A protein has these predicted regions:
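Glycine-rich, proline-tolerant flexible connector loops at the mouths of alpha/beta enzymes
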Residues: 53-73, 132, 138
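Aromatic- and acidic-residue-enriched carbohydrate-binding clefts of CAZyme catalytic domains
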Residues: 35, 39, 82-89
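Residue-level detector of anion-binding/catalytic polar loops
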Residues: 52-53, 79, 126, 279
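Short loop/turn segments at strand-loop or loop-helix junctions that form parts
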Residues: 17-23, 85-87, 130-135, 176-179, ...
């Protein structure tokens, strides 16, 4: 099974993907359309799709499963690219985790987060992601926003202190993943800017450990430009991870194949990452659709990877001097035409 690589690229050239990408086909309006493939059996499917770096939640690979997961990863020559605690699946987190109004739930969330740090290190991942999941509100004044912000500061500071104390220079870094809505009507840390502000308020000793995991679809759901979101993270030195997919306008989170909806913007994103010499993992957060049968469940990864390889190669051929020239003369329509020529 050959690994798909993005080359030439600084740093990590393999592609990442989550075990949840190969799910059972549920959505809010319908049950499963495929059998639930056991998590460790999904790893070989990811390997067959050319993936190098695996991603998983703690509810998918718990601490008790870490030894078995490491054996499977080793057998297929894979690595753990990212690990993340689920602060949304368990009903106890129905009103949030770190921002819950229930102190017992906040205590449980912190315990789970610290256990996830241990699992991240044990699995050999360098990055642990926090997705804002159910951190938010559906009714006005259901939570005090200022209290919620302070609770997040307290929680993330505790995670940072734990990682520094127990793992020192071997501590993973933490990437906060913004999303504006879904499953909550209004979510805290809804944009890259909010995440960067929160990081600036963490204890100074913890700030270097925290960055951002921007996702294409989440930026588009917020009506924002994901290229600028990524550039902002790069400018702040906080692009710790990235999730690639596609999103058809400001609708529900679709997790469509990368390169499908806005290929010119995806081409431009590759240009930005190349020029920044970014060394992290290019990872997919996509979802096999309900209509795909089990035999085709990895098609979304094959399609995303093929699109990424093509776009990356085309981006390498974009003449940066021409782009600079169009900028200097403010010939933006001509620039758009040039990029279309590079793409098509």
């Amino acid at each position: 099974m050959s690994k798909i690589t993005i080359s030439p690229k600084k740093g990590k050239q393999g592609i990442g993907a989550g075990v949840w990408n190969l799910g059972i086909g549920t959505d809010p309006f319908g049950g499963p359309t495929r059998r639930n493939i056991p998590i460790l059996e999904r790893i070989p499917l990811l390997a067959e799709a050319g993936i190098t770096y695996i991603e998983a939640h703690d509810v998918e690979i718990g601490m008790d499963q870490v030894p078995a997961a490491k054996r499977v990863l080793s057998r297929y020559g894979l690595k753990m690219g990212m690990y993340t605690p689920s602060f949304f699946a368990d009903p106890v987190f129905k009103d949030g985790a770190m921002t819950s109004n229930d102190p017992a739930v906040r205590k449980l969330a912190l315990r789970n987060a610290l256990q996830a740090v241990d699992a991240t290190v044990e699995l050999g991942a360098e990055v642990m992601v926090f997705w804002n999941g159910r951190e938010g509100f559906d009714f006005v004044l259901a939570k005090s926003g200022r209290d919620a912000f302070r609770r997040m500061l307290d929680g993330f500071n505790a995670v940072g202190e734990y990682a520094r104390k127990n793992y020192g220079k071997n501590a993973p870094v933490f990437a906060l993943e913004p999303k504006p809505n879904e499953p909550r009507a209004n979510m805290y840390l809804s944009t890259v800017g909010e995440v960067l502000y929160l990081i600036s308020r963490l204890d100074r000793a913890n700030q270097p450990l925290f960055g951002v995991n921007p996702e294409v679809a989440h930026s588009r759901m917020a009506g924002l430009d994901y290229i600028w979101d990524v550039e902002l993270c790069l400018e702040a030195g906080k692009l710790f991870h990235i999730h690639l997919n596609s999103q058809d306008t400001c609708r529900y989170d679709q997790d469509l194949p990368f390169g499908y909806i806005e290929p010119i913007k995806d081409l431009a994103l590759c240009v930005v990452l190349q020029d920044a010499k970014w060394e992290g993992i290019l990872a997919f957060d996509v979802k096999a659709p309900r209509t795909d049968v089990e035999e085709d469940i990895a098609d979304i990864l094959h399609t995303s990877a093929a699109n990424l390889q093509r776009l990356w190669a085309k981006a390498l051929k974009v003449d940066r001097k021409k782009v600079a020239g169009y900028r200097s003369t403010q010939q933006y329509t001509a620039l758009a035409g040039y990029l279309a020529k590079c793409l098509y």
